[in-house]
Amino acid sequence: KPAIWIDGGVDSDEVISTEAALGLVHRLLTSNDKDIDNLRKTRVFYILPNLIPDGSELHHHTVLRPRDSTLKPWDDDNDGKFDEDPPEDLDGDNMALQMRVEDPSGDWVKDEKDERLLRRRKPDDPGPYYERYSEGIDNDDDGDYNEDWPGGIDPNRNYPGNWSVKQRGAGAFPGSENELRSALDFIYDHPNISASQSLHSTGGVILRPPSVPEMKLPNADLSLYIALSERGLNITRYGLATSVYQWNWPRGSKNSGKGQLRRLENGTIKGMDPFDGGANHYGHLDHEDAYAAYGGALDGLYELFGVLAFANEIYRFGEDLDNDGRVSQSEQLKYDDEQMDSKVFKAWTPFDHPQLGKVEIGGWKKFGQNNPLPPYLEDEIERNVEFMLMQARALPLLSISDVKQEYLGKNIYRLTTTILNSGFQPTELAIRFVNNKSVPVRSYLSVSNKVMVLDDEKEKEIDKINGNGKEEVSWLVHGSKGSKVTINVYHPKGGRTSKEIKLSR
């Protein structure tokens, strides 16, 4: 049966992703809804709630907010030692947050919008100037603070397909991490997977390929992505759907480029014309702020396996008050003050650091900014479950809608079969044809020894069947009236179906 792949817990501090995956499991196992029952019968859900479980355990049970990494020991600073300089809880509040310290040569100044924040220093800023660090000490006495955390290889930069050794966190080679390799082997062994969602946080953004400037999407696939993205925005109520490469984070932009979908202030969704003069491939404009992500899941699943791959950045903390397409940290602070009772940002407090002297410790806590607090968890999960179910409904699904018989005399019949794809997604994405990896829809007849198939081509092939589309195939057979013939149709991503008929005049 056609399948969708769901994974969470790829980034260890994004624990809402695991909860959302489990929310889907719960819905599928407990719902009596007729639509859910139909999905259980006609589709397959492969759900991996937590790709890096030891990372999320670190998040839940220690003071650390782990980075996007496996916990395989890694020498970040190339000093021959592994994971020797992590952040620490210095002030005993059971959190490892941030530190800021006055420094005449510092690169930061207090933000005039809100002095709890720092911004980059400009040439004419009068000071005082600051440096900022994660909370902790210089454990290895190399002059750097907390530069060698646990682990260091990012599984979402370790995928084959657009992998680069220069990408931070890429690892020694594509698929080097055991957790990711196990997932890749499973996906490779299950060619019925035609769609995926990789669950992440935060930002309230629906992401799609490409993640790098070298990759171009065929227009047919881009149109499909845009249509499903718009539906996803309506379901999740998020503000932006974009390619990873165009998502101008962290510096931000209005996110109003070609192929992006953005929710306007009045709630309507505006789509930017993605097509470049009717070309066969979508061409985006390179930009110095673009967020290239080599070795990411979306490009790997899409290009290597022909999977319509989305990543959902679950949860957005704060409101876009100036309608510039992003939620700034000053807007988040205002939201925390007015809506969250200041539960998410810890005020800066003085501390005597054993190496830096007088510092301030404070900043964003683990929960609230990147993951919703408990009162907001259920609503966030349910909206994302609906998005995943919507994508599952869109999977290609083959059926035999009609069989016509034409008697030609002398016990010869022409059988004409209409094959329907009732899913929104085609049986093959356009990228599969570009890469010469496409698999046709195959149909053939099963007959008894009393029936003979007269066609030279016993198996009929159709390159692809578009979403909500249909195609016809026909055979000539010889057999007596009442003989049974079974028509079989198969595509790895569209499923298998058959229909038995009796020859009749």
Residue ranges and their predicted role:
Residues 44-54, 60, 66-67, 148-408, ...:
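Metallocarboxypeptidase
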Residues 17-61:
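Short helix-loop-beta-strand segments that form the rim/entrance of peptidase-like active sites
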Residues 495-505:
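Edge beta-strands of extracellular beta-sandwich domains
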Residues 42-167, 215, 302, 324, ...:
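Surface-exposed loop and adjacent secondary-structure segments within mature catalytic domains
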Residues 483-492:
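Short, aromatic- and glycine-rich surface loops/edge beta-strands on solvent-exposed regions
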Residues 419-434:
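Short amphipathic, basic-aromatic surface patches that mediate peripheral association
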Residues 473-481:
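Short, hydrophobic beta-strand segments
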Residues 460-469:
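Short proline/glycine- and polar residue-rich coil/turn motifs
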